[in-house]
């Protein structure tokens, strides 16, 4: 597989993926190559082929790790999140919307498996929040909220280590409460962001603006 890996190092990812695929098809016992094949297809944003490769690995390998499920979930999530209108103001087609939802539901299912097997980790909760928020649905914030709350509960045990994830989750909560016009609740989350990163421009702006709405 030296040739395939050399192609990959030279950013010829599609060509590398095809070499890996031929090798696996010629010798189906070489299951470990499926992950490399999936990674190469992922690099060229051929998400369907990447998903297919990772799923084959999970189905066939004897030493599947929880991280393999997590990584497959991330590919599903990236595939779903990549489906957007091509121009501002253009409504997404029904078929694209259905494809996006299917990918994101696939991601959510895999992240739910991660939560089940590793409830002490914040990653499953955080990515379930991301997947549900990305769904093009008015109920998306409501669907995502419990997962972000669970992620926060885990991450707040070590705020400095988990600062990036906490800022993301606090931002979601802040935006969510603005949508509900619960400005005091929203303000608390922007303040939490500033405790972790006093230079966060968005949080500074919201901390200045929201008190005006609270006083009205």
What are these regions (language model features)?
Residues 1-180, 202-215:
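Alpha-solenoid helical repeat scaffolds
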């Amino acid at each position: 597989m030296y040739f395939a890996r050399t192609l990959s190092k030279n950013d010829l990812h599609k060509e590398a993926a095809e070499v890996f695929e031929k090798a696996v098809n010629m010798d189906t016992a070489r299951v470990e190559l499926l992950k490399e094949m999936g990674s190469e297809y992922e690099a060229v944003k051929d998400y369907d082929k990447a998903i297919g490769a990772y799923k084959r690995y999970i189905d066939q390998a004897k030493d599947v790790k929880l991280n393999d499920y997590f990584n497959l979930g991330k590919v599903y999530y990236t595939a779903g999140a990549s489906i957007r209108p091509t121009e501002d103001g253009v409504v997404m087609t029904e078929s694209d919307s259905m494809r996006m939802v299917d990918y994101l539901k696939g991601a959510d299912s895999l992240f739910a498996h991660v939560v089940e097997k590793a409830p002490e980790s914040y990653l499953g909760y955080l990515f379930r929040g991301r997947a549900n928020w990305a769904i093009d649905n008015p109920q998306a914030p409501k669907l995502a909220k419990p997962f972000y709350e669970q992620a926060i509960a885990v991450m707040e045990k070590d705020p400095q280590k988990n600062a990036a994830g906490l800022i993301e989750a606090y931002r979601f909560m802040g935006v969510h409460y603005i949508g509900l016009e619960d400005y005091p609740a929203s303000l608390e989350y922007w303040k939490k962001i500033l405790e972790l990163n006093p230079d966060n421009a968005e949080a500074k702006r919201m901390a200045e603006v929201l008190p005006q709405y609270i006083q009205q």
